[in-house]
Amino acid sequence: MFKKIVKSIAAIKTENDRDECYWQIDRAFEEERISYEDHELLYGLAGMVEVA
């Protein structure tokens, strides 16, 4: 799951893409598929991606 989300983050081109990534991250955490630490790390990475 972690790798799938990282790939989604790498593909961010718009704010909608970023929102979709945030949703995926939250859902994976709620389903206990990623840890809290991974949740925070992925949120940080998604927030760093610049969009046009």
Q: How should each PLM-predicted stretch be described?
A:
Residues 1-30, 43, 50:
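N-terminal acidic leader/helix
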